Design a protein with these regions (language model features):
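A conserved FAD-binding loop/helix module that cradles the flavin
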Residues: 542, 548, 619-642
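Residue-level detector of alpha-helix initiation sites
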Residues: 296, 391-393, 416, 476, ...
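Internal hydrophobic alpha-helix adjacent to the cofactor/substrate pocket in enzyme cavities
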Residues: 323, 327-329, 520, 524-525, ...
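A conserved short coil-to-beta-strand element within the FAD-binding core of flavoproteins
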Residues: 453-465, 564-575
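Flavin-dependent oxidoreductase catalytic cores
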Residues: 1-388, 392, 396-403, 407-408, ...
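Glycine-rich dinucleotide-binding loop and its adjacent helix/turn
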Residues: 364-378, 442-443, 453, 460, ...
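Rossmann-like dinucleotide-binding cores of NAD(P)H-dependent redox enzymes
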Residues: 407-446, 521-566
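Glycine-/small-residue-rich beta->alpha transition segments that form the dinucleotide
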Residues: 467-469, 473-479, 590-602
Length: 642
């Protein structure tokens, strides 16, 4: 049978190393999966092994520490020099090899936040690299020490089973990137910015040192930006030239975004915003294999990128988190069954910023993969299960329960599935969330779940149906503030698809994620919008990365303004009144008002379904208004408990 993804699944050879297909996994900061151990624990090993099991050709892990050891501002570093750390790192490589993938390790180098601390100063490529911190220029003696340290690391990595390593020089923020950028490299010696050869000299010397220590067959992945921001002196044309300058030193070139905040593309950008840069480098005649990264998960898009010759290889980080079986589904020709990443960045932020439990919005197993053998035991008997509510929590619960063999009926009082996610159909910047909603609906259509649309479930109906268990996922309703004139406001969910019914001038009450997204949707439809937020900052409920990106996109619109520290006191025909931080009464004139003050759990509706005839589980917003990740995780947990 002809493969649907023949090019993506074709083997690829670099030197004497053969990759089974073109799909790599990108390194991520996963240390929130464990405690402060300086070695990978069972949670980390299981996580990476699952990617190999799911079909990845290369699993690139994060990461070993740089020389010299610095204060632990870097959450990514294992200690490669401790014997017991080496044992666990060897187990990690072995687990990856067990499923047929190559094991690669990202070797961490200094960043602006975690550099080389020597004699009380932050040692960097050039003086003044880090604003607000005392810095010293790296001496040639220290550069030699760094090369020696890299050799020591790769010798150990090769000995304990790793096939390759990765060096990071993207975004001009790391050690190697600092040499590349004119903004950070102010040296006056042969490593200075006078030519591209000079700026790459130290990198190439390090690559040569690695190959000298570990051999040519120990491959080097090199991550770089296809271009850097204005002022850095590095364009896509420079990147094409650079590819030729490193091709005899490194083995694979990752082509990434210009900045750290662009590296994690979200729904504000096209799905694969970096492919054009990889294509440019390929077309330049560079001989080094080119890997593209950024936003990949659609198997058809990936197949086209390889088949058209725009790139040789593709790497994904979040794609493998959302669906660790992505590669398996490629081999089975089931691209439509790949779980879409919604690009919310809760994975990155939970691990790298918040330092709490590692999570994924669409993969409820994330963070507990190593526990699933004891958590997800086969049911002792198959039961008749009702799920009430067709939002993300209800659909996840129904699918999970059905996959366990139970007989499942899903009741949804409206004529369509999707619940609170249906708004995403109308907002271009939420297209990833819309894909996830459509994915759940499609999976239900293929499943044995009986879906009853337009049916409001009642306690009497459930008792009469002889259900053994009921999962209640009836969601939440928009919270309406108890203020004069509140009846004049439109709830935020109503706005989507009905934007033309609102006046040109709109005030949105509430500056959380829902309110700010609604405001952005309205300005993109031609409205003039002011967001009124009681707290001193907007978007306090959003993940840090999404908050930064949404704030940035809001800032592009002159007709979108925000007022913070203002407590709404009423709505009149003239507009919205509020009390400012000084206690003065103010008026925001407008023709329409949108209420985005939060959601109220439909707890009474949930409680009305309780009966001793069956066991009840409440999940999602009807238990506590939260986000999609928490709703889906709770739904999954309830379903595997039956």
């Amino acid at each position: 049978m002809e493969s649907r993804y023949a090019h993506l699944l074709s083997p690829f050879q670099v030197g004497n190393v053969v990759f089974r297909n073109r799909m790599f996994t990108a390194p991520m900061g996963l240390h929130a999966l464990q405690g402060g151990e300086l070695y990978p624990t069972e949670a980390i090993i299981t996580h990476y092994a699952n990617k190999a099991k799911g079909g990845a050709a290369v699993v690139t892990c994060s990461g070993t520490g740089a020389y010299p050891v610095t204060p632990d501002k870097d959450h990514l570093a294992y200690d490669l020099y401790i014997g017991h750390s080496q044992h666990y790192l060897a187990q990690l490589a072995d687990a990856i090899h067990f499923y047929g993938a190559k094991a690669s390790m990202e070797i961490q180098a200094a960043t602006r936040e975690a550099g080389y601390y020597v004699s009380g100063g932050l040692m960097v490529p050039g003086p003044g690299m880090v604003p607000g911190q005392p810095t010293k220029e790296l001496t040639k003696e220290m550069l030699a020490d760094i090369k020696k340290n890299l050799q020591d690391q790769v010798k150990i990595l090769k000995r304990i089973g790793y096939d390759m390593c990765m060096l990071h020089m993207a975004y001009d923020m790391g050690l190697f990137g600092g040499f590349l950028s004119l903004r950070t490299n102010k040296r006056e010696d042969e490593y200075g910015p006078q030519s591209l050869e000079n700026r790459l000299r130290f990198l190439n010397e390090c690559c040569d040192a690695i190959h000298q220590a570990a051999g040519k067959d120990f491959l080097i992945e090199l991550r770089m930006s296809g271009e850097l921001p204005e002022g850095a002196g590095f364009t896509i044309d420079d990147a094409c030239e650079m590819a030729k300058l490193v091709e005899n030193h490194a083995d694979i070139l990752h082509v990434h975004a210009a900045t750290g905040w662009q590296a994690h593309c979200m729904s504000f950008e096209p799905d694969t915003p970096n492919l054009w840069m990889a294509q440019k480098i390929k077309e330049s005649g560079a001989k080094i294999p080119v890997l593209t990264i950024g936003g990949y998960q659609d198997l058809d898009e990936m197949e086209d990128a390889i088949a058209s010759g725009k790139a040789d290889l593709i790497s994904m980080a979040r794609g493998w988190l959302a669906d660790p079986n992505l590669g398996t589904k490629a081999y089975e020709g089931r691209g439509e069954d790949v779980v879409p990443c919604v690009k919310c960045m809760r994975c990155h932020d939970s691990a790298c910023i918040d330092g709490i439990a590692f999570v994924c919005t669409v993969n409820p197993l994330m963070g507990i993969e190593h526990e699933m053998e004891k958590l997800d035991k086969p049911p002792k008997e198959l039961k008749k299960v009702a799920v009430v509510g067709g939002g993300p929590a209800g659909m996840q619960a129904a699918l999970t329960a059905a996959n366990r063999g139970h007989h499942v009926t899903l009741f949804e009082e409206k004529e369509t599935l999707g619940g609170q996610l249906n708004f995403a159909d109308y907002a271009q910047f939420k297209h990833s969330l819309a894909k996830y909603k459509d994915y759940l609906i499609y999976q239900l259509s293929k499943s044995p779940v009986e879906v009853a649309l337009g049916v409001k479930a009642t306690r009497e109906m459930l008792v009469k149906g002889n259900f053994d268990a009921v999962i209640v996922a009836v969601g939440a309703s928009p919270l309406i503030l108890p203020i004069p004139g509140a009846e004049m406001a439109v709830p935020a969910p109503y706005v989507y698809g009905n934007e033309k019914e609102l006046d040109r001038s709109v005030v949105v009450i509430g500056g959380g994620q829902v309110g700010c997204e609604t405001a952005l949707q309205l300005v993109e439809q031609g409205h003039d919008v002011t967001v009124l937020e009681m707290q001193e900052k907007i978007l306090v409920d959003a993940s840090a990365s999404y908050r930064n990106r949404l704030t940035r996109n809001m800032g592009y619109h002159e007709n979108l303004k925000t007022v913070t520290g203002g407590r709404c006191t009423g709505i009149t025909s003239a507009g919205v009144t509020y009390q400012d931080a000084e206690g003065n009464e103010q008026l925001l004139a407008c023709g329409s008002v949108v209420m985005a003050a939060g959601m109220r759990p439909r707890r009474a509706d949930a409680l009305a379904l309780y009966d001793p005839a069956y066991r009840v589980y409440t999940v999602g917003d009807c238990d506590k208004a939260a986000n999609v990740q928490k709703a889906v995780r709770a739904a999954f947990a309830a379903a595997i408990s039956i």
